[in-house]
From Swiss-Prot:
Residues 130-225 form the Rhodanese domain. GO terms for biological process: tRNA modification. The active site is at 185 (cysteine persulfide intermediate). It comes from Corynebacterium efficiens (strain DSM 44549 / YS-314 / AJ 12310 / JCM 11189 / NBRC 100395). Keywords: Oxidoreductase, tRNA processing. Pfam families: Rhodanese (PF00581), Rhodanese_C (PF12368), UPF0176_N (PF17773). Belongs to the TrhO family. GO terms for molecular function: oxidoreductase activity, acting on paired donors, with incorporation or reduction of molecular oxygen. It catalyses: uridine(34) in tRNA + AH2 + O2 = 5-hydroxyuridine(34) in tRNA + A + H2O. CDD domains: RHOD_YceA. This is tRNA uridine(34) hydroxylase. Its EC number is 1.14.-.-.
Length: 312
């Protein structure tokens, strides 16, 4: 019986020929029937792939044969190839699009000048020692924090990683520059870069969590400082660290607790992801993001008795 798994991984290391790495990775994944998304740049590699567990193990072995990836850590998650529509392997200026390709410097040890790495237990120890002085700083898109975040975290008003530089240069967070700031994100990669960008802009004591939220949640479940669900970028949309998790998200229409993001019914112009409970999503009249144009489209569909989910 085939057992599916998902691999999450990244490595910051100098790549002199990203195009050659792209071709090799594509051929390797195709030969192992893996699907997912891999980004490659001169700074390294960032990937999420899924497939049969034995094929995933073979992928790890083969990928680690490349000298720059020999020590790369792979995180396992539930799922499989079916959680991804296809295989995508691309070369980009950055493996995370902060819009600062020339600011980031890497060597064989990773990003130069990033925040101090903390293991999950060291995060708790820092909070025990420094108390309320410690600030958790969300390194994800603001939307992701709607369903889960570290307790009392600062959540920057950003829609994409491209927004972060403008946000941290805005002056909103200048009062944090002398405080211990723990940046966090899903698997750690965004904070490798964000922590470096913050240090370059005057933040004096910046940390990042080894393995990100995923590793922290694996260690402490719902008994630590993390609250709620974790947004993930595949068909699952979210994951939890046990059954007794706190539900932070609420339906935008009826305020029912939910951790499920759904697309707005306005497929041509919007498709925004918003939190909707099953009942409101099932009703085409409330299957919208709340914007005036989308409300009108949903009302028109309902009046005509048309439900795109039924007619697809």
């Amino acid at each position: 019986m085939s057992i599916g798994k998902i691999l999450l991984y990244y490595a910051f290391t100098p790549l002199s020929d990203p195009k050659a790495v792209q071709l090799w990775q594509r051929d390797l994944c195709e030969s192992l029937n893996l699907r997912g998304r891999i980004l490659i740049s001169e700074h390294g590699i960032n990937g999420t792939v899924g497939g049969d567990i034995n094929d995933c193990k073979a992928y790890i072995r083969k990928t680690r044969e490349y000298p720059g990836f020999a020590k790369m850590e792979f995180k396992w998650s539930e799922g499989g190839a079916e959680d991804f529509p296809k295989l995508s392997v691309k070369v980009r200026d950055e493996i995370v699009a902060f819009g600062a390709p020339n600011e980031i410097k890497v060597d064989e040890n990773g990003i130069i000048g990033g925040g101090v790495h903390l293991k999950p237990e060291e995060v708790n120890q820092l909070v025990e020692e420094r108390g309320d002085e410690v600030v958790f700083f969300d390194g994800r898109n603001a939307m992701e924090a709607q369903i889960g975040k570290f307790r009392d975290a600062v959540v920057p008003d950003v829609n994409t990683t491209h927004d972060f530089i403008k946000e941290i240069e805005s002056g909103k967070y200048d009062d944090l520059k002398d405080k211990p700031v723990v940046t966090y994100c899903t698997g750690g990669i965004r904070c490798e870069i964000l922590s470096s960008l913050m240090i370059n802009r005057g933040f004096q004591e910046v940390y990042q969590i080894d393995g990100g939220i995923v590793r922290y949640g694996e260690k402490f479940g719902n008994q630590g400082l993390w609250e709620g669900s974790l947004y993930v970028f595949d068909k699952r949309m979210h994951m939890e660290f046990g059954e007794d998790y706190k539900r932070l998200g609420h339906c935008i229409h009826c305020d029912t607790p939910t951790n499920k993001f759904e697309h707005c019914v306005n497929e041509d112009e919007c498709r925004q992801l918003v939190l909707m409970c099953p009942d409101c999503y099932a009703n085409v009249e409330t299957r919208h993001c709340g914007q005036d144009d989308c409300v009108e489209i949903a009302a028109d569909l309902a009046a005509r008795g048309v439900d795109p989910l039924v007619t697809q």
